Swiss-Prot record:
Residues engaged in binding Mg(2+): 454, 460, 463-464
Domain B5, residue spans: 401-476
Keyword Secreted: no
Annotated GO MF terms: ATP binding; magnesium ion binding; phenylalanine-tRNA ligase activity; tRNA binding
Entry's Gene Ontology BP terms: phenylalanyl-tRNA aminoacylation
InterPro entries: aa-tRNA-synth_II/BPL/LPL, B3/B4_tRNA-bd, DNA-bd_dom_put_sf, Fdx_antiC-bd, Fdx_antiC-bd_sf, NA-bd_OB-fold, Phe-tRNA-ligase_IIc_bsu, Phe-tRNA-ligase_IIc_bsu_bact
Cofactor(s) named in the record: Mg(2+)
Pfam families per the UniProt record, alphabetical: B3_4 (PF03483), B5 (PF03484), FDX-ACB (PF03147), tRNA_bind (PF01588), tRNA_synthFbeta (PF17759)
Entry similarity comment: Belongs to the phenylalanyl-tRNA synthetase beta subunit family. Type 1 subfamily.
Reactions catalysed, as given in the entry: tRNA(Phe) + L-phenylalanine + ATP = L-phenylalanyl-tRNA(Phe) + AMP + diphosphate + H(+)
Domain FDX-ACB: 701-794
Name this protein carries in UniProt: Phenylalanine--tRNA ligase beta subunit
Gene: pheT
Length: 795
């Protein structure tokens, strides 16, 4: 929105500078984007009258004139403008004048003829007007008056950026209202009376879409002179707001648009057949617009039409068939309230954006239409003459917006602002904003104004109070609070500690989308149901993940496609499992997942780089589990999973309950995904391992430890982990360490069996153990493994 500072000051004129005014506007939430002078820097230019105008004797394109500038004699001035003529009021730069660009006017001769000044065009004075030739001033312009004073050129054009909710400030009236509120000044609105009808002509209105157009006004004005010039003051105000003067009818409707924020339109009455219809377009209808383009109308487009077809796109663009031109004698003025949702997006649908659509789709004051009609009628009769008919209105009260009533609690206001504003001041602010307000029991009940569509909730009222009270008036007080140390159990394991351990093991943390490709997810987890998004970002991201593995495998593939063969990634996050018994029908589980592929170690001169295997990943996971309280109770139990290699996969169990899985990606799946080499993954429930071992001091034994090595022959199906657990259980407190150091199958061991070599370390804190005591521990271990696994000592 661009507006003239002087125009606003006609409505409200606070005793502040331009800079201070812009600061106020910005702090009101109407951000000032720029300020520029409406004219260049010049002096010595006055209003003159061309008394004589003759052809230059030696130049076809020059004229010799005598100009009256109010002095004791006429000035001889040579002019090359084609529109220079006798009787014209002009802008005359006299001797000594300085024009933009430090161009000084001196007496000179042009092709032998004396010239004592210059007749100026708009561009020569730094005024942005598209016009050929010199400036043509009104015939009543007082001769000798300084042009800057006559045209009020000591003015600034201020441009502001408005958020979509502040459509009420897309007008001089709205901006002045805000400035008046913050400066505690009354706004001086232009005074005009309702124009009485002098002719009986009426316009019939057929309001077929009241939900889209709850209020529609038309008025006939006959015998207008559309060739009458728009007054200079109107042209200048339009120009300073960025609108070019076209003809008096268009200029007047644009003027009302800028002054009140009410878009209006004018039809040529001779081209309209009554009744005028307000309806939605029919499929296949077309409309030739005022710019000559043809719009193929869609059924969601609101139209102004008659029995012959569309006349205009309601609230967006007029049609050429009913447009006003130089031959127009009678006009029909339109002023309406179109529902924002009926206009929103329609202009963009046709590649258009107009001042009218910009306002209607944000919301125009629904009480403004009649006032704007009266103002436009007054101006039109003053400028173009004519006779006005009665204002014809069709409206639907049930579809008109209702002003909102919102309550504001004193406690909420104080809490959000962090500052106490006197009750009377708050009430006064609401009154100055034009709201109706009552206060009782520490609650303000506020009814907003018809021009404020954005007042809907309590926070909106708090924003209004803060804006008008002044953000800079709210002190910068640090918040006061009673601090309490956050409880932290010593047994809680910080997730950051786990992440650090994995980073130390040469892993990198990944963050993948919670939305995954349902095809890939069903490939990995065919028996798990996934949540499908109703409005996904894309087809490839239309399901919620039931595991983090699909995202990590995607990251592996992404890296491999970029020549990164060694990949070690981990991720923590939620997986989403449909569960009718869970809140909202979905169980959200926080898990830790990891993936490795490529070589176990980076390339190095000291050794050959070997590919990763199952036990590399298992070892890394065991290192993580060693930090947890239940790590020594975790078991890896062979189990098959859909996504994993049947011979290289295991369930992760804690106290017999499955909390995760580990293994190699199934070769067929790896091939379908395009993965290179073997890829190993694990996923484990974080909550199951989120406790850590609380450090307990233990006395270090001063007595020697004794080691005994046993080679136990067991069936192939016996897990080594279960055998070791049985040894620890049978050995009691004196058995301080059990370690598996060899697995053998071959000569000397029957087929279907394996030899597990384990070391048993026996020690006591109180004394040196005798052989009998050591042998007792060993015998207890042998008896236990014999009973549970039918283990035999290897010969």
């Amino acid at each position: 929105m661009k507006f003239s500072e002087q125009w606003v000051r006609e409505w409200v004129n606070p005793a502040v500078s331009t800079e201070q005014l812009c600061e106020q506007i910005t702090m009101l939430g109407l951000e000032v984007d720029g300020v520029e002078s409406v004219a260049g820097t010049f002096n010595g230019v006055v209003v003159g009258e061309v008394v004589e105008c003759a052809q230059h004797p030696d130049a076809d394109k020059l004229r010799v004139t005598k100009v009256n500038v109010g002095g004791d004699r006429l000035l001889d001035i040579v002019c090359g403008a084609a529109n220079c003529r006798q009787g014209l009021k002009v802008a005359c730069a006299t001797e000594g004048a300085v024009l933009p660009g430090d161009f000084k006017i001196k007496k000179t001769k042009l092709r032998g003829q004396p010239s004592e000044g210059m007749l100026c065009s708009f561009s020569e004075l730094g005024i942005d007007v598209e016009a050929d030739g010199i400036i043509e001033l009104p015939l009543d312009a007082p001769i000798g008056t300084d042009l800057r004073e006559y045209l009020a050129l000591d003015d600034n054009a201020i441009e502001i950026s408005l958020t979509p909710n502040r459509a009420d400030c897309l007008s001089i009236a709205g901006i002045a209202r805000e400035i008046g509120v913050v400066n505690k000044q009354l706004v001086n609105q232009p005074h005009f009376e309702a124009v009485p009808a002098t002719i009986s002509d009426k316009v019939q209105i057929d309001l077929q879409a009241p939900e889209a157009c709850p209020r529609y006004l038309l008025r006939v004005i006959k015998n207008v002179n559309v060739k009458a010039p728009s007054p200079m003051w109107m042209q200048e105000k339009l120009r300073r707001c960025g609108i070019r003067s076209i003809d008096p009818i268009v200029d007047i409707t644009n003027y009302i648009l800028l002054e009140f924020g009410q878009p209006m339109h004018a039809f040529d009455a001779a081209k309209v057949t009554q009744p005028v219809q307000v309806r939605f377009a029919k499929e296949g209808e077309e409309l030739v617009l005022l710019d000559g383009s043809t719009a193929k109308l869609q059924s969601n487009t609101l139209l102004i039409a008659d029995q012959n077809g569309p006349l205009a796109m309601a609230g967006i663009f007029g049609g050429a068939t009913s447009g006003v031109n130089s031959e127009t004698k009678d006009v029909i003025l339109e002023s309406a309230f179109f529902a924002p949702l009926a206009i929103a997006g329609r202009a963009r649908q046709y590649g258009l954006h107009t001042d009218a659509s910009h306002r209607f789709e944000r919301g125009v004051d629904f009480e403004l239409a009649r006032k704007a009609m009266e103002r436009a009628t007054t101006l039109l009769l003053e400028i173009c003459g004519g006779e006005a008919g009665e204002i014809c209105e069709a409206s639907s009260e049930t579809h008109l917006p209702k002003v909102n009533t919102v309550q504001l609690r004193r406690s909420k206001l104080d809490a959000l602002l962090g500052h106490h504003i006197e009750t009377g001041s708050v009430t006064e602010i609401f009154h100055r904003l034009g709201f109706d307000v009552t206060y009782a029991n520490d609650i303000w009940t506020v009814t907003s104004a018809s021009w404020r569509f954005d007042i809907e909730i309590e926070e909106d009222l708090i924003e209004e109070v803060a804006r008008i009270y002044g953000y800079n008036s709210i002190p910068n007080n640090a918040p006061l609070a009673h601090l309490r140390m956050r409880e932290h159990k010593e047994s809680d394991l910080d997730l950051a500690r786990i992440k650090t351990a994995l980073v130390d093991a040469d892993y990198q943390e990944a963050i993948t989308y919670s939305f995954v490709d349902p095809k890939i997810q069903s490939l990995l987890h065919p028996h798990k149901e996934a949540l499908v998004l109703p409005n996904p970002i894309s087809v490839e991201m239309s399901a919620m993940r039931v595991s983090l593995i699909s995202g990590l495998l995607g990251a592996v593939l992404y890296n491999q496609n970029r020549q990164q063969s060694r990949v070690r990634l981990f991720e923590t996050g939620l997986r989403f499992v449909p569960d009718a018994n869970a809140e909202f029908g979905v169980r959200q589980e926080f898990v830790l997942s990891a993936v490795i592929t490529g070589t176990a170690k980076s390339e190095h001169w000291a050794g050959k780089a070997e590919s990763v295997d199952f036990f590399d990943l298992k070892g890394d996971l065991e290192s993580v589990l060693s930090l947890t309280e239940g790590g020594n109770r975790v078991r890896f139990v062979a189990k098959q999973f859909d996504a994993l290699h049947p011979g290289q996969s295991a369930a992760i169990e804690l106290d017999g309950q499955e909390i995760g899985f580990i293994g190699a990606i199934h070769p067929s799946i790896s091939q379908k995904l395009g993965l290179n080499g073997k890829t190993f993954v694990f996923e484990i429930l974080w909550n199951a391992i989120a406790a850590r071992n609380v450090v307990q001091a233990k006395e270090i034994s001063k007595f020697p430890a004794n080691r005994r090595d046993l080679a136990l022959v067991v069936a192939d199906s016996v897990p080594a982990g279960e055998l070791i657990a049985a040894c620890k259980q049978a050995g009691g407190e004196k058995l301080v360490q059990v370690n598996l150091f060899d697995v053998y199958q071959g000569v000397g061991v029957a087929e279907g069996y394996k030899s597990l070599a384990i070391s048993l370390t026996v020690q006591d804190n109180e004394k040196t153990l005798e052989d009998e005591e050591i042998n007792a521990v060993i015998s207890a271990v042998l008896a236990e493994v014999k009973q549970r696994f039918n283990a035999e000592l290897r010969d």
